[in-house]
């Protein structure tokens, strides 16, 4: 029952947000999605139309956070496009906003491996997300067109734990990245 800030990237109609709202009674929940299909309203739920592929929209969202003195999130959930490049770009843009002890969660990060028709935008010269998570855990630098060595070293310094879990559905893989 403590006050926490949650950010969900990719809210769709807001079903997850509704469960967060009822479970975390004092949470302020921020939702960003490029489509407005959101079906819930509350003074504790803030929806922003934001396509995280468009830097100007991310910039506007960050300005809103700064203007309202929202400096951190206890939890950030990336349930957005599930595409490789979007996942890594979101991680680089938002992970620093996690409070100490908080979690950055990535849902369904193996979609392109399981659904052959799903967009696989993994560059041929890049390692996949599973390998990135292993390297982050081992604190070993890796080649990436998105996560530069400066950001990787930041992660090595602040990540305390990385846990991957298999969900009930075939494509459901989720990772919890905890910040020290």
Stretch-by-stretch model annotation:
Residues 1-180:
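S-adenosylmethionine/decaboxylated-SAM
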